[in-house]
Amino acid sequence: MNMTGGGAGPQAGPNSSCNIPNSSLLATAPVAATMPIAQLADGWLELESDPGLFTLLLEDFGCHDVQVEEVYDLQKPIESPYGFIFLFRWIEERRARRKIVETTAEIFVKDEEAISSIFFAQQVVPNSCATHALLSVLLNCNENNLQLGDTLSRLKAHTKGMSPENKGLAIGNTPELACAHNSHAMPQARRRLERTGAGVSSCRFTGEAFHFVSFVPINGQLFELDGLKPYPMNHGGWEDHEDWTDKFRRVMTERLGIATGEQDIRFNLMAVVPDRRIAITHKLKMLRTNQAIVSGTLQKLLKADEQGEGGNGDPQRPDTPSTLLEPSAFTARDLQSLLKNLDTEIAINEQHLADENDRRHKFKVDASRRTHNYDKFICTFLSMLAHQGVLGELVSQHLLPSKKISGQSAANRLNKQSNATANAGATAAGAAGAAPKSQQQQAAAAKNGKSPSKTPGRRRKGRNKCKKRK
């Protein structure tokens, strides 16, 4: 499901960065030389809600061990997620939003010390909610489990202790983030920004927008981080026998029940998870190590059996790194069966790794198609067709046949109606002409004293019969 997530926020003016310490702007980055700091906050573009786009965006941020997956079933278990990103339709005046605001106002965390201890940034830059949602998940994770990269590590260190508003300005004025964000936008997003004016989100003021929020576990509590809210929201902890994802499922189920009260099902849920290729590669390494151990043990066992059959005394026990693979523990048949299972597992995981690499390649192909501007090609192609004089013929062949067919059918219907009318008129006219003729015959017969009921034809037949009798 691909939807554009603009998510408008208050417009940051050209001098908005003066409220932030200079060290937090990361102006020393090489990209800053080509992009003025004052214009960064005014040029963020809308992004689609696509897991491939978000995965490549994380790579551009410098975080290479993470990927984003779309969640289709809340009840399906997800392995080791860092957090969730929820995209929903944003309409401020709708009834469901008032219900959500009433329920979330009670769980706002207003303690300044608690707010400063986590990474919560208000969205002060329009159209930056996609990057905000990703950073809200990544910068609240344990650094021991996740390698953020230079850009995000520097941003996290420089914004430590800042207010949520200044953190939002720091995000908007970071050149690496702005360039990476805009590099994945469609050309239509740039044209919309130019039409509506810099720094203003077009869909916010038309009442139609999609907004991203993040759900992440922090210190045993489930937090909802929404850059358009004044405070972070604490949904509470979870039971000792539960995982934090169980708590998230309950919260999200309730949220979807409120949000879809008006039959609006346009939402999207994505999970930020570790790169699947890392786990598959680690598993393949372990399987290949076990394969080598089992294969070596099997070869030594077979060799020992051959020596025993040759009458050289007791076979020597093979030297193995594990006592579990001693000949006394496994027979040759057991080792062959185990080796076959390992070969199957290795083939399956190699296929999984190839599938993940193909997915990552497909992400890049889709990104190239998404961000490429086809306007020049289409205009040039149509101009060449018009110059060769074939454009009009192609248009008439592909666009006009339906109109011709409908016009011909209408004409046929009119012709049938006119023919039916003409036939009916002719029949009526014939009937009208025959009536006076019969009336004249009856009048002449009455004048001659003959019965009008007897026809002349019948009288002739009677006379002919009389002549024959004579």
From Swiss-Prot:
Active-site residues per Swiss-Prot or TrEMBL entry: 129 (nucleophile), 211 (proton donor)
All residue ranges annotated as the ULD domain in the record: 373-401
Family: Belongs to the peptidase C12 family. BAP1 subfamily.
Subunit structure: Catalytic component of the polycomb repressive deubiquitinase (PR-DUB) complex, at least composed of caly/calypso, Asx and sba (MBD5/6 homolog). The PR-DUB complex associates with nucleosomes to mediate deubiquitination of histone H2AK118ub1 substrates; the association requires the positively charged C-terminal tail of caly, probably due to direct binding of DNA. Interacts (via ULD domain) with Asx (via DEUBAD domain); the interaction produces a stable heterodimer with a composite binding site for ubiquitin.
Protein's UniProt name: Ubiquitin carboxyl-terminal hydrolase calypso
Reaction catalysed by this enzyme: Thiol-dependent hydrolysis of ester, thioester, amide, peptide and isopeptide bonds formed by the C-terminal Gly of ubiquitin (a 76-residue protein attached to proteins as an intracellular targeting signal)
Site (Important for enzyme activity): 226
Sequence segments annotated as region (Positively charged C-terminal tail required for binding nucleosomes): 403-470
Transition state stabilizer (site feature) positions: 123
Cellular component terms (Gene Ontology): chromatin; cytoplasm; PR-DUB complex
Disulfide linkage: none
Assigned EC number: 3.4.19.12
Ranges for region Disordered: 305-324, 422-470
Compartment list: Nucleus
GO biological process: epigenetic regulation of gene expression; heterochromatin formation; protein deubiquitination; specification of segmental identity, abdomen; ubiquitin-dependent protein catabolic process
Summary of the function given for this chain in its UniProt record: Catalytic component of the polycomb repressive deubiquitinase (PR-DUB) complex, a complex that specifically mediates deubiquitination of histone H2A monoubiquitinated at 'Lys-119' (H2AK118ub1). Mediates bisymmetric organization of the PR-DUB complex and is involved in association with nucleosomes to mediate deubiquitination. Does not deubiquitinate monoubiquitinated histone H2B. Required to maintain the transcriptionally repressive state of homeotic genes throughout development. The PR-DUB complex has weak or no activity toward 'Lys-48'- and 'Lys-63'-linked polyubiquitin chains.
Keyword list, A-Z: Chromatin regulator, Hydrolase, Nucleus, Protease, Thiol protease, Ubl conjugation pathway
InterPro entries: Papain-like_cys_pep_sf (IPR038765), Peptidase_C12_UCH (IPR001578), Peptidase_C12_UCH_sf (IPR036959), UCH_C (IPR041507)
Extent of Low complexity compositional bias: 422-451
Domain of life: Eukaryota
